[in-house]
Regions:
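Rhodanese-like catalytic fold shared by cysteine-dependent sulfurtransferases
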Residues: 1-20, 24-58, 67-105
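Short, surface-exposed ligand- or partner-binding patches at beta-edge/loop junctions that are enriched
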Residues: 62-63
């Protein structure tokens, strides 16, 4: 499993070419908190919407704790996406280590 820590992602987001962020959580979860500029594709819609992603882009997937996004990362790798990472610990770890102002749930 190729994962990226919250601190590594924070650093990558300030790069000239940041990764594409994809939030795989449910709609209600995105209303509580989310990362700026993330594309929201709920896990159950992924098969129908995968064409919205470029297989050549660096993609970082996230969810609440990293479990659902890990499953989607494996799915994308199986489709030939080369640079796919899962946010280790999801937004829960992000809120504890990078952004303590983010709402936790």
């Amino acid at each position: 499993m190729n994962e990226i820590t919250p601190q590594q992602l924070k650093d990558r987001l300030s790069a000239p070419q940041p990764p594409v962020l994809v939030d795989v959580r449910q709609d209600w979860e995105t209303k509580l908190c989310r990362l700026p500029n993330a594309l929201h594709i709920p896990i159950e819609e992924f098969e129908l919407r995968v064409e919205e992603l470029n297989p050549d882009d660096e993609i970082v997937l996230y969810c609440h704790q990293g479990v659902r996004s890990a499953a989607v990362a494996n799915y994308l790798r199986g489709l030939g996406f080369r640079d796919v990472k899962n946010l280790e610990g999801g937004l829960d770890l992000w809120s504890r280590t990078v952004d303590p102002t983010m709402r936790r749930y």
